[in-house]
Amino acid sequence: PPMDKVVYIIFNQNKSGFIPLHADESDKTDQKDFFTQNDDFKCWIQHAGNEESLYLAILPLWESEAPERKRIVDKIISKYRPLCQTE
């Protein structure tokens, strides 16, 4: 989907709540297959079962620069250890 400058987290849900799978940041994009082209997409599906079981959280940061967004993503990764995170 089209997005402006954001930090995003992909989740799946189980009985105990939402499980973070992947966190990242993005500049503005109009790429419709932005998420499905992610290198970790197969891992997301393995954990969620199907695309419909994936959830997306977005933190809009319209006036931000990439280093600021990266700092936020690094904090998220450090605290929540998303299951499909690759660096």
Q: Where are each of the predicted segments found?
A:
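Coupling/hinge elements of helicase-like and P-loop NTPase modules
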Residues: 82-87
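A broadly used, surface-exposed interaction patch
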Residues: 31-50, 55
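GIY-YIG nuclease catalytic motif and its immediate N-terminal context
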Residues: 1-34, 60-78
